[in-house]
A protein has these predicted regions:
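Beta-strand-rich cores of mature extracytoplasmic or soluble domains
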Residues: 102-170
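Mature extracytoplasmic domains of secretory-pathway proteins
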Residues: 67-131
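Basic/polar N-terminal segments that are highly enriched at the extreme N-terminus
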Residues: 1-5, 31-36
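N-terminal export/targeting and maturation segments
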Residues: 35-76
Length: 170
């Protein structure tokens, strides 16, 4: 029989509460990314689900006419099938003008545009939009983070605005 010391009980309770808070925050604070999977390739065959690289399209919600394509690894196997696998942190991004540019409103100088979970609780992939006013371009940066530590692995893409189009700023 294992006894818990009264000195360690508050620490254990704090750890459980902190874990629950992070789990709740990850479901509430990380918005659901509306991705459209446009393609994928298998990289490692498994009977229970192959590892693969997927390409997803994300339309910028505030800038009509701009789509970002993100490629990233998805873990297969039993854990991947159940949705509890932790996907690798590597991702690549390419953003393009795919139609007429229209702004839904003024943009922040820098804003988190998309987030998608890469593990059950603790890891997310982000796409951040940065306005480069000097060059009249929208710059999109992708990176991943964890509750404890992030990743320096990142990728960047820029979409120049057509001549005569000014980016409205807040």
């Amino acid at each position: 029989m294992k006894f818990i010391s009264l000195r360690t009980a508050p620490a254990a309770a704090f750890a459980v509460a902190l874990t629950a808070a992070f789990a709740l925050a990850s479901t509430v604070l990380v918005p659901f990314a509306h991705a459209e999977e446009v393609g994928s390739v298998n990289t490692n065959f498994r009977i229970t689900g192959s590892d693969r690289v997927v390409v997803e399209a994300y339309d910028d919600p505030l800038v009509q006419g701009v789509t970002c394509y993100v490629s990233r690894a998805r873990t297969g196997g039993v854990k991947g099938t159940l949705g509890i696998a932790e996907d690798p942190t590597e991702a690549s991004i390419a953003c393009r003008q795919v139609g007429a540019i229209h702004f839904s409103g003024p943009l922040k100088q820098q804003a988190d545009v998309f987030s998608v979970s890469m593990s059950l609780i603790f890891k997310a992939l982000h796409v951040v939009r940065v306005v480069d006013t000097k060059r009249n371009a929208l710059v999109y940066l992708t990176y991943s983070d964890r509750v404890v530590s992030g990743s320096a692995k990142n990728s960047v893409s820029a979409v120049p605005m057509p001549a005569g189009t000014t980016i409205p700023l807040k």
